[in-house]
Amino acid sequence: MRLVYKFNIGQNENISSLCKISNNLYNQALYIFRETLSKEDKWLSYFELDTIMKNTKNLDGNINYKLLKAQCSQQVLRIIDKNIKSYYKTVQDYKKHPTKYKEKPGLPNYKKRGSEFNLYYTSQSCKIKDGKIILSKDLSIPIPQYEKYSDLIKDFKQIRIKPLACGYKIEIIYEVKDTEVSKGREEKIASIDLGINNLVTLVSEYFTVLFSGKFVKSYNQLFNKILAKLNSIKDLQKIKGITKRMKKLYYDREQYIEDVFHKISRKIVDLLIDSKITKLVVGYNKGWKQNVNIGKKNNQKFTQIPFARLVSYLEYKCELAGIEIVINEESYTSKCDSLAFEKIGKHENYLGKRRKRGLFQSSTGKLINADVNGALNIMRKVVGDSCESIRRIIDRGLLFNPVRITNVFC
């Protein structure tokens, strides 16, 4: 499995210069592809584009391709090739299913002139030595916590440098051996329901845990307030595009969400390992943000939480721990009565009902947290009602006394 060790660095003139060359190469190669397609009706392959760019000069008379290391230039062209192939597949799908799309797909766009684009270094074009990434004789990047990660990253596959509002994100891609899912052990299952006030509701026969999402919601509310203020200032000054302060605001939010999601996913997987859970079921509907309709305010709260990223963090951490993870759609799981084993699906009348916000009244006469009810139904969707884990979860009564975690930073 491939993993990424990430860290950020500040502004660097040498890296900035290389990123601008990368941006110029991207735009130049894309222009040649589009012109060839328009005039000759020919799709240039990666190899054809690579051959052309090796001899194509820029406006200053230099060859962008040769201003970077060969492997870096090749990786930029591969990104273009990947984007073009993705466009082609999307167009073919659009012709068959036009209703899936809001508008007709377009060719990849040019990057902003004078801006910066990613750099990609393979193990052939750079090395890690003495706690530093050596990009050239005059350019190296210190690696934080090198002693902790040195054994993992010494045989890296690729290093990516991504421009940010306040510097650069460095990503070291390395490989680890996959941990096999243990077989022969007694199956123990946990399930997760994702939401807003309760970001994660985790249910198993050993624990019922609610990870509060209110601090994420509060952060997003403050983010929206500041962004609205910056937008009004920008409009008054008649500034086009996004300002530096807005870029910094987006950057800070990105860092905050990434940190929170890593901490939550780590705590979840640690709980699963301690309880010897063998399978985790996660309720997640792909594309649910596009069609969500839970009111204007709730829509904004919901769509500003990148649940797909949290799910991806859980996937790779469970895989490393040898825990099987199943991603399943969660339709009607919040409406059906889990304690009464109501069949999960659409009904004219449901056995249970919402007593008040966050509380579900079961037809068995018991009250249960609404998100806990949803999490248990997500598990039922995958393993069925005859599964011993379902019976044990209900019998042990931990469903009715969930533990709430409001601070993931300690």
Question: For each of these PLM feature ranges, what is it?
Answer:
Residues 1-75:
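Gly/serine-rich nucleotide phosphate-binding loop at the start of the catalytic core
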Residues 38-55, 59-60, 165-311, 389-410:
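Substrate-contacting helices/loops that form the catalytic groove of nucleic-acid
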Residues 48-164, 300, 304:
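Acidic carboxylate diad motif detector
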Residues 299-410:
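Positively charged, low-complexity nucleic-acid-binding target-recognition regions
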Residues 124-136, 199-203, 357-363:
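Short polybasic amphipathic segments
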Residues 132-142, 172-178, 204-206, 339, ...:
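Secondary-structure transition/turn motif
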Residues 25, 29, 72-87, 370-382:
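Stable alpha-helical structural segments in soluble proteins, enriched in small hydrophobic residues
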